[in-house]
Curated annotation (Swiss-Prot):
This is ATP-dependent protease ATPase subunit HslU. SUPFAM superfamilies: P-loop containing nucleoside triphosphate hydrolases. Belongs to the ClpX chaperone family. HslU subfamily. One of its GO terms (biological process) is protein unfolding. InterPro entries: AAA+_ATPase (IPR003593), ATP-dep_Clp_protease_ClpX (IPR050052), ATPase_AAA_core (IPR003959), Clp_ATPase_C (IPR019489), HslU (IPR004491), P-loop_NTPase (IPR027417). GO terms for molecular function: ATP binding; ATP hydrolysis activity; peptidase activity; proteasome-activating activity. It comes from Shewanella denitrificans (strain OS217 / ATCC BAA-1090 / DSM 15013). It is found in: Cytoplasm. Coiled coil: none annotated. Keywords: ATP-binding, Chaperone, Cytoplasm, Nucleotide-binding, Stress response. SMART domains: AAA, ClpB_D2-small. Pfam families: AAA, AAA_2. One of its GO terms (cellular component) is HslUV protease complex.
Amino acid sequence: MSEMTPREIVHELDAHIIGQNKAKRAVAVALRNRWRRMQLAPDLRQEVTPKNILMIGPTGVGKTEIARRLAKLANAPFIKVEATKFTEVGYVGKEVEQIIRDLTDSAVKMTREQQMKKCRFRAEELAEERILDALLPKAKEDWDSEKKDDSGTRQIFRKKLREGQLDDKEIDIDIAAPQIGVEIMAPPGMEEMTNQLQGLFQNLGQSTSKRKKLKIKDAFKQLIEDEAAKLVNQEDLKEQAIDLVEQNGIVFLDEIDKICKRGETSGPDVSREGVQRDLLPLVEGCTVSTKHGMVKTDHILFIASGAFQMSKPSDLIPELQGRLPIRVELDPLTANDFKRILTEPNASLTEQYIALMATEGVTISFLESGIDKLAEAAWQVNERTENIGARRLHTVMEKLMEDISFDASDKSGSAFVIDADYVTEHLDTLVQDEDLSRFIL
């Protein structure tokens, strides 16, 4: 779990996302509260439930980007799902309980990687012995002289192996065969049986190995993975992963506004109000059956987000509204925000294009006047047509760099300066003509 303070979390998010301080502060406090809760006495810890968050804001202002960056900072089981991919129980499609199953799978993977890192040193020793066994047939136990010779030879080969002198030599080695995932389609209500069958098929394939001819440097990497996997206790791993999900799990529900029931619609809403009702027990706290064991959702943090352009938060069913107590509104982006997005974040759009063209030997430089004009153009197109937020910058930048990108391979050694005149020449007609803007930008 991340031990970063809210200020440190916001600072990290600032490196990638411009503005939206209210949303950043809300998720930073929520993430820090996960750590604070774990410092409490066990009795009190059980009573402290997470305060779920609803982020409201137009498309392209940074809601999903906050989730992506938060996943890297959290150091905890994290899953981002689209609410529109789920249907209510009884209909064809994914049920909402699959969210918790996927979250548990990611926790098992995370825990396995952590445990394999801990036993990597021992795994390297065992992998080295297996390679030496493949290089040197074992001496017969009856002949002491041969044993001694073999031991000396083994040390010589061990030294060569560690120095990398044998990296390109090929050996035949038994490698654990990759497990084949088995997807079983089952009717609603039969998830437990499905999980048991999947576990059975996975157990059947665990002991299979495949003989391969590999270079020693490639074989060594695979053998380390094999040996580390053998050293990991699977039962302990599952227990730790489930505990990690229950205490620190985070679910990001994107596009939640798309499952709102709008007042003017009539008839069954298979993927709308029914999905909200199915989400209720997950958000409130229930027990979900997974192939790794039973998972309680009482202390999983849910962060929902939506644009709410065709609906409003009050269109969510009241019970679900009550379980998303923290509301954060994200601000629409201005021309000044666009300018900052082009220059300030790590690996900004301008940096990316400069680096891409440098691979062809072409030098690109963006002047401040050019960046100002570019930001203004993107903002104007958003105002005149559909407002898609920062995503408009990708469209405008691609159109601006179209000629340079196409000719770059033939113009190695040349330099281009992107100033206000260059931007005006390449974009002004498109920006001013509303019909062209709708189709091209």
